[in-house]
Amino acid sequence: MESQQLSNYPHISHGSACASVTSKEVHTNQDPLDVSASKIQEYDKASTKANSQQTTTPASSAVPENPHHASPQPASVPPPQNGPYPQQCMMTQNQANPSGWSFYGHPSMIPYTPYQMSPMYFPPGPQSQFPQYPSSVGTPLSTPSPESGNTFTDSSSADSDMTSTKKYVRPPPMLTSPNDFPNWVKTYIKFLQNSNLGGIIPTVNGKPVRQITDDELTFLYNTFQIFAPSQFLPTWVKDILSVDYTDIMKILSKSIEKMQSDTQEANDIVTLANLQYNGSTPADAFETKVTNIIDRLNNNGIHINNKVACQLIMRGLSGEYKFLRYTRHRHLNMTVAELFLDIHAIYEEQQGSRNSKPNYRRNRSDEKNDSRSYTNTTKPKVIARNPQKTNNSKSKTARAHNVSTSINSPSTDNDSISKSTTEPIQLNNKHDLHLGQKLTESTVNHTNHSDDELPGHLLLDSGASRTLIRSAHHIHSASSNPDINVVDAQKRNIPINAIGDLQFHFQDNTKTSIKVLHTPNIAYDLLSLNELAAVDITACFTKNVLERSDGTVLAPIVKYGDFYWVSKKYLLPSNISVPTINNVHTSESTRKYPYPFIHRMLAHANAQTIRYSLKNNTITYFNESDVDWSSAIDYQCPDCLIGKSTKHRHIKGSRLKYQNSYEPFQYLHTDIFGPVHNLPNSAPSYFISFTDETTKFRWVYPLHDRREDSILDVFTTILAFIKNQFQASVLVIQMDRGSEYTNRTLHKFLEKNGITPCYTTTADSRAHGVAERLNRTLLDDCRTQLQCSGLPNHLWFSAIEFSTIVRNSLASPKSKKSARQHAGLAGLDISTLLPFGQPVIVNDHNPNSKIHPRGIPGYALHPSRNSYGYIIYLPSLKKTVDTTNYVILQGKDSRLDQFNYDALTFDEDLNRLTASYQSFIASNEIQQSNDLNIESDHDFQSDIELYPEQPRNVLSKAVSPTDSTPPSTHTEDSKRVSKTNIRAPREVDPNISESNILPSKKRSSTPQISDIESTDSGGMHRLDVPLLAPMSQSNTHESSYASKSKDFRHSDSYSENETNHTNVPISSTGGTNNKTVPQISDQETEKRIIHRSPSIDASPPENNSSHNIVPIKTPTTVSEQNTEESIIADLPLPDLPPESPTEFPDPFKELPPINSHQTNSSLGGIGDSNAYTTINSKKRSLEDNETEIKVSRDTWNTKNMRSLEPPRSKKRIHLIAAVKAVKSIKPIRTTLRYDEAITYNKDIKEKEKYIEAYHKEVNQLLKMNTWDTDKYYDRKEIDPKRVINSMFIFNKKRDGTHKARFVARGDIQHPDTYDTGMQSNTVHHYALMTSLSLALDNNYYITQLDISSAYLYADIKEELYIRPPPHLGMNDKLIRLKKSLYGLKQSGANWYETIKSYLIKQCGMEEVRGWSCVFKNSQVTICLFVDDMILFSKDLNANKKIITTLKKQYDTKIINLGESDNEIQYDILGLEIKYQRGKYMKLGMEKSLTEKLPKLNVPLNPKGKKLRAPGQPGHYIDQDELEIDEDEYKEKVHEMQKLIGLASYVGYKFRFDLLYYINTLAQHILFPSRQVLDMTYELIQFMWDTRDKQLIWHKNKPTKPDNKLVAISDASYGNQPYYKSQIGNIFLLNGKVIGGKSTKASLTCTSTTEAEIHAVSEAIPLLNNLSHLVQELNKKPIIKGLLTDSRSTISIIKSTNEEKFRNRFFGTKAMRLRDEVSGNNLYVYYIETKKNIADVMTKPLPIKTFKLLTNKWIH
């Protein structure tokens, strides 16, 4: 919008408080809040003074016209909304104040915002004019784009306008703490100076330069009150204001006095603490400088002893002098003079090698008397510039920040400009300190730097050979890792991140491009005149313009201060739209240490403390700049969150107010922590801590008890330590009133030593806050260290001691020093430190034999207090040792943690950090002959007797006694240890054994149990049923489970929605029993099974055994007989072979019962359950004999491997209560968080793909207008229950693509924010299977579609707010949601209603009644699952027409059009489908199972003997109570949820033969006994062995044009505990199995007929619903049939006898069945039990029967 003059509009009425402000349209890549520098009206002191002394009426207010000033519009015109921030109500610069109004009133009456207070923009008088100012405080300013219309008509006008530009006035920040007042005052003084009020600021002598006016005093008071709230003022400021609330000048005067009170001593201490020497200056100059500082400090009473001085000097040595830093390890009494002798020797050797001069050694007398001073040759120079020169020559242009570059390429440019610098410009204003600071760019989107002297401009530099810019926003065609070296005048390297093109669009509509380098490490953006000259552009300082050689004016030049600038508005921005991840490669020497690594190294201290420590050199070896702090703000350490979780913090200021000031080590605080229970006797149960009041130095001592003599020993030790080490005497010890402190023995001891005990008063916990906070901090650190490292709990005090060492070395933010510095000790050298629990290999110098390994695995604890070694815990020796003979265990294999801390061990960084110390140790350490046998004096764990660990990764194979094949030895596994096992061993309770963990094998005879109703396809139903006998012991391999889902709504593993439909029951699946019924051998069984696997290309053979189908009554008509034959004809029923009696050998008949040992093995047995052992079997040798290594379940989980664990409290789990409690399977997280996918992902390729997915998701969110970008809300203004947390999750889909999704935390969403009655509907699996079956029979085309970001198309009705994504950097703001974000409770329902409406209204579809998400019209059928659509049509063009309509509204992607006549492969909702139109369809999950099953942490047997059935009959789950540890119980329940969840998902999809076993185990999720776990492993093993099986469908070849829908029903009477019956049904459409159901009967049946009636009654409703669906999708006639193997049930259904039943419940069911059968034209027929394929749904079957019933439909 073009700016308009004030004269075009009438004056605004006097009654308006504020007026609308117009603004110019800005470029799309420019911040709409940015204002051109030319829009700021010039202001000076003269005009201020003049305006303050005159009065002008509003009508006579004259404002000079300026085309760059925005003029007001009438009040009726609404203010424009150009950005995400609302326009503030403010008055324009050309608007006069209403008459009779003065903004100088009481402060509470001020109607304007704080940033309108500066007299820089309006004169301080009643008739002042208010300027336009950015609406967001602190928003950087920039110039408008060339399209905004702000062009210059000629060079003279441009010169006049631009030269009048003044710098902006930014308001000071708000004061938020009394401690921040000194820093705030500096910014406030600078604000006054920038507002041309510097003359009123008091000088050093306390007097201002000029007298302050009343208006200025009012302005001073008002701004001080607004920006410095009274509650955050220091006490001394409040005291001044209490006397005179307007005396701001006195506050400023006193603040300036405090700022000027920095003494020479403080400067000398800072200089001494930051010494740096590398030999670039003479050694005697360095010595003179240091000795002068030390002498001055000593003369002023600050004593610097030789030890401290040497440590400070050596810490600053670098280069060839660096090795002297470690001489303190060899010479503890070295003096400063001796140290400088070594420095002089090295320096003179260097000079001698350069100049061939003899070495020179100085005498100490020379050192004392030498008072020469040397100039530091590396001191940066500030070049004086002459801005008055107006020569047009290029060589005399303004010079600024000259740099030189060298490119490592054939065309080398090594221009070196002398007398130039990249140091900050010499500022006219001494308070503009921030302008010279080194800048670091955290993002690449900044178009401006608010700290620039002239923001939004480039500094013209005649000396720079290259153009440098800090922001990548304007860089085109950027490429990272440029091979370019850039140096300044002092030959210091400037790191370059990228190189690209800088494109200009000048006002004559010409475009020009020059090369530019990107670096954030310069003070200003530099534009090289040399590079401009190369493209025929010169700078004319006469006219102050950039022009071409022909005189064409391109852009004006701004003269600001002593330099010349050009606006950035002529730069064309690049197409960067979102922040990018900085992957700029740096060399080894410049690569920074990751913050999480330093965080873990320093005992998990917070970032603020670590930064203070590095700034103040309390941590040595590297500086603050060596750490990458980019992730410090948002980084959340999981171990800290777990270990340091607390309710609230202690009250601050807890020390007594009447406490006097003491010298160091005269006033101590002490407290005792403990006891820690369940530890071995050798480990301490308590610790006592001491804290010095003055220095905050801490000590900790272990205690085994709280007896008087134990406490007295500690007091004696610490008092002697303080007296000898610090030459101090303790005067007061503060403690609580515990009996350990108030006893007579300790009281007499303190009295004897002249120490005053200071006890806390009653109910005065605040007085003991120092000791309480220390104990809490140390305990938090202890929990965090143990959690992170995985070390056993008996090492808890080692974690306490490690934390104490680190805490004493970290600087306090308040005192800026560490406790060690206060105590006069040197800082902690971090290169000598290892992370707590770091895996190491310790050298064993005295092994048991010469061939015994020399390395012992161990875990580093903390540095030794008595040597230069390290305390290391050796689990194999059950002790800790003090040694230096260790090597850090490297690689990904050595990770200790359970939170996927792949990036937190940082082997490479650790090597760099400890390299120098390791080399020093290697060259200087004294070999200790008995190193490993010397235990630490505080090695309180040394004598702990540990039980040996159970073997890990032991593979065994059970061999049948009749099997001639010897067992596998598996030597490969014995040589290879699982990588995940390299972890600190957990503790194992020596008192826990199988006898008190495993339940007994007795079964209750009179149980009582209630029922749980079942749902389709098994899973969650309680089944107190025996499980089948396991087949054979499988070889085991350890693995981890990390399933990858297909998407975030439906995955190929399982989801919460789908498990609600997958509750499939099972019958007796395994277990143990004292008696085992003999079975036929495997070989004989195989001979008796007739395999009839049908060919895929040919149609299945006709069933020729129809004579086995026995009708209930003879059909009276040929039609009924044909109907029966038609129903039976195409069913996949087994072909029964002719039977012959089986004779067993005589010895077998005499075989006594064999006691089973299956409950002690991993899979339930030591041999093949189908094999026989004869009495006459001969004994075998040890090699040939059957062996079994019993592997406990605990040894498979590497996280639970513990070397020692005290007795824990047991939890009793009752079977009935556990089974009752099972409601649903808890979904397992299959996605990655941001830190896992990107931040700490060491897989570079995968990380880049996730970054790309992240950017794609952010762009999609912005494109879909997901939230309101016009307004941002403060968190305090919004009801917390309407605020939804959000996060990014990442996932790798099955097709290999990487996915990122921004989701809401709906799991913690408040119920008031959504309608609980709304449902998120998805297509039922039976509907999908029915559609697929009809597609095969009718030669349909199948098209698969995907709608990207489907939920974002649905509007949200509720008022909800989310926190902005992290890249926006607005942590304290909220944005309002406009779309249904993924994860919200109502998002699924909103999307369903949206897409349903579109399909019906725009696509002409209608939803099938009773089957949600199934839509149809005359040609097309659609199955909808969230954003996946499956289209079925006989005409492919009909599908394409639907796709075209969908693309008009939604981003629709065609996954598979399905137009080929050959075999087409689909991945539909987790099913891997192979479909050849008109021939066959195969449904399986081989690829998915091959990927997921090995990750379940279950031992699989990929090459050994395969299981032939998921279980065997004859064994039962024990009913006894399960006594188990609490933690172990939770862990096993979690594992059961994971295993059964995946198995339920697979069984629900297509493995209907497993539903019985899945249902049974699912009911025992909360009863994870050893037996239940073994049976679950056996089921997973069978799924692995049969992962290649598929559900095979062939195209139906009917004799009649009818659809045949059949349900086969079966029930097992009383085969469940407590006389419950198992029922099962299988549903077939045109001979193809489309679904199955297995569950336990809800009522207790009293006969087999009642059980069968119950099963039939469960099948008929679903059969009728499927019939309706088939008729809607296919208009052919349908024949419905029901098959059961119960003649009595069929008789009752078909009978017309209405006599009373003996049981009213089943009588009601029977009568209902009669009505349903007769009313729905349902045919009921008998099927022989041997051919009833539903038998697999109700009971465990022998291998032969199981194969016979399933190999016709799944193989």
Swiss-Prot record:
PROSITE patterns named in the record: ASP_PROTEASE, INTEGRASE
Residues that bind Mg(2+) 2: D1346, D1427, D1428
GO CC annotations, alphabetized: cytoplasm; nucleus
UniProt KW keywords: Aspartyl protease, ATP-binding, Cytoplasm, DNA integration, DNA recombination, DNA-binding, DNA-directed DNA polymerase, Endonuclease, Hydrolase, Magnesium, Metal-binding, Multifunctional enzyme, Nuclease, Nucleotide-binding, Nucleotidyltransferase, Nucleus, Phosphoprotein, Protease, RNA-binding, RNA-directed DNA polymerase, Transferase, Transposable element, Transposition, Viral release from host cell, Virion maturation, Zinc, Zinc-finger
Residue ranges with Low complexity bias: 153-165, 960-969
Positions with a binding annotation for Mg(2+) 1: D671, D736
Ranges of compositional bias, category Basic and acidic residues: 1044-1053
Locus of motif Bipartite nuclear localization signal: 1178-1212
Domain RNase H Ty1/copia-type: 1610-1752
Region (RNA-binding): 299-401
Protein name: Transposon Ty1-DR3 Gag-Pol polyprotein
Source organism per UniProt: Saccharomyces cerevisiae (strain ATCC 204508 / S288c)
Gene designation per UniProt: TY1B-DR3
